[in-house]
């Protein structure tokens, strides 16, 4: 009897496999193929110029895809408290859309005050739904910098002064965002705890302090939450800018923690071609904008990892080893988001999101 039941089960399984339609296109377009197989297949079809093209912005909030292969561009958006209104392609002015509203979610300091991981999951899920509805691939949040000085005007964006609490609350937020096919870009990595002269300040920190206070929430987001993206910060850590800081990005993040996602620069945070290429930056955003200001529309080709990168490869200054790693990470992000196998259309602002925002705010009033 058991043997007959086993054979029947096998037969049904084989029949189900045979009934599945055979995919007749390239592996990278097959939604049912493993992500890594899709990545390697797409990478093998790309030119050096196309790979380099993916590593820099093409507009204020998007980076390039590979149109020849049907691989879409990557769209970034602020968080972490609501989806940013659309802006013009090359300017910071709003585009004037009438369908780009968002729910105003509570500040993350309020979320942390709930001490409730279910609330954090609700927050991430809700904001992730709105990001996906607006066709955004990377949500620039959550922020988990530690509150170390009351003079930091962005303390409200973070989850407080306790590394333990921040580490517990960031995980469900990240998971909630990413189950919608949107990458949570955890920021600002790392030791970015003041706004005054943030682009020149040098945070001199010993290893014990770094690992016990400033990194636990980032580590939890990566290793427990499975974060798909990390944003580098404007400041220097021990004398090197953080958007291409070898110790932070190569040794700790991608080495010790095994992070397989993308590192995105804060807007205008990339300062040097060679360091960016060799020290772990994957997508360069906002260069020549001084972080917040306007820029010429043709400046994208002058980014540190744009034409200078391509020129350096042609001259033999750089190998394609680092480039292939960057392209793999970007492709992996695309196949996890806009080209993921399970389509997700998200939800526009709705009563459920209004209720979620109010419930989280009420729970955080302590």
Where are these regions (language model features)?
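Bacterial Sec-dependent N-terminal signal peptides
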Residues: 1-24
């Amino acid at each position: 009897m058991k043997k007959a039941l086993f054979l029947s089960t096998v037969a049904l399984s084989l029949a189900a496999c045979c009934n599945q339609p055979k995919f007749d296109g390239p592996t990278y377009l097959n939604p049912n193929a493993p992500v890594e197989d899709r990545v390697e297949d797409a990478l093998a079809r790309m030119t050096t110029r196309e790979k380099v093209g993916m590593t820099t912005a093409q507009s204020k909030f998007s980076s390039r895809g590979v149109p020849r292969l049907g691989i879409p561009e990557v769209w970034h958006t602020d968080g972490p408290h609501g989806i940013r209104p659309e802006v013009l392609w090359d300017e910071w002015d709003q585009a004037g859309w009438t369908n780009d509203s968002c729910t105003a979610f509570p500040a993350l300091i309020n979320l942390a005050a709930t001490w409730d991981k279910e609330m954090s999951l609700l927050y991430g899920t809700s904001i992730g739904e709105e990001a996906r509805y607006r066709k955004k691939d990377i949500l620039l949040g959550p922020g988990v910098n530690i509150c170390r000085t009351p003079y930091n005007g962005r303390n409200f964006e973070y989850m407080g002064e306790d590394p333990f609490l921040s580490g517990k609350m960031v995980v469900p937020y990240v998971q909630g965002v990413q189950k919608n096919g949107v990458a949570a870009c955890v920021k600002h990595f790392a030791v970015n705890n003041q706004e005054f002269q943030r682009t020149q300040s040098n945070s001199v920190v010993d290893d014990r302090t770094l690992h016990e206070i400033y990194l636990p929430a980032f580590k939890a987001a990566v290793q427990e939450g499975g974060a798909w993206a990390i944003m580098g910060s404007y400041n220097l850590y021990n004398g090197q800018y953080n958007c291409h800081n070898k110790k932070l990005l190569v040794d700790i993040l991608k080495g010790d923690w095994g992070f397989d996602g993308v590192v995105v620069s804060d807007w205008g945070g990339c300062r040097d071609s060679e360091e960016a290429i060799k020290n772990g930056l994957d997508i360069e955003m906002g260069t020549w904008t001084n972080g917040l200001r306007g820029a010429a529309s043709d400046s994208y080709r002058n980014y540190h990892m744009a034409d200078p990168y391509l020129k350096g490869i042609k001259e033999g200054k750089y190998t394609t080893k680092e480039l292939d790693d960057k392209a793999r990470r970007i492709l992996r992000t695309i196949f996890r988001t806009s080209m993921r196998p399970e389509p997700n259309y998200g939800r526009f602002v709705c009563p459920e999101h209004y209720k979620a925002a109010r419930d989280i705010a009420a729970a955080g009033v302590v």
